[in-house]
């Protein structure tokens, strides 16, 4: 049965221009904060789509919190439009690259994390963090497995890798169970 995998965060980056006047941009944009003594970038939070955008003087822009790449692109275009209308010289349609996606799913069972921690590429220190960290090399992602059966997959570039990772973990857990019991 195909697992229900839900994307919960997409982080993208792009270049919207060069030498951005962040003080001016902060004055123009609603919900923008610019405190250079705290953080070198301007932080702008949108409610629709619900994302946070980080804009740097270099023109680099990161968008986080989107549920899909399309939402991030919409948010970036909204910001570019607002800044251009205020006279800023920016790139109209910048190339947007996915840096990371985070997905969640369920195993459908409560795994024995102590047993799984015997596998290579796993870390489990319940005193420090309740989840088991499982680093896969293909696809190159990090899978967090919790005792409740909840799974978080991070480091994704494409959704297909979430399914590959889930299949690989499921297969490995079945093999481990057969070996141990």
Swiss-Prot record:
Pfam family for this entry, one: TBP
InterPro entries: TBP, TBP_archaea, TBP_CS, TBP_dom_sf
Domain of life: Archaea
Entries under CDD domains matching the protein: TBP_archaea
A GO BP entry: DNA-templated transcription initiation
Database matches in SUPFAM superfamilies: TATA-box binding protein-like (SSF55945)
Gene3D superfamilies in UniProt: TATA-Binding Protein
A single MF term (Gene Ontology): DNA-binding transcription factor activity
Keyword field: DNA-binding, Repeat, Transcription, Transcription regulation
Residue windows of the Sequence repeats: 7-83, 98-173
UniProt similarity note: Belongs to the TBP family.
Family matches, as PANTHER family: TATA-BOX BINDING PROTEIN
Function: General factor that plays a role in the activation of archaeal genes transcribed by RNA polymerase. Binds specifically to the TATA box promoter element which lies close to the position of transcription initiation.
Name of this protein: TATA-box-binding protein
Organism, scientific name: Methanococcus maripaludis (strain C6 / ATCC BAA-1332)
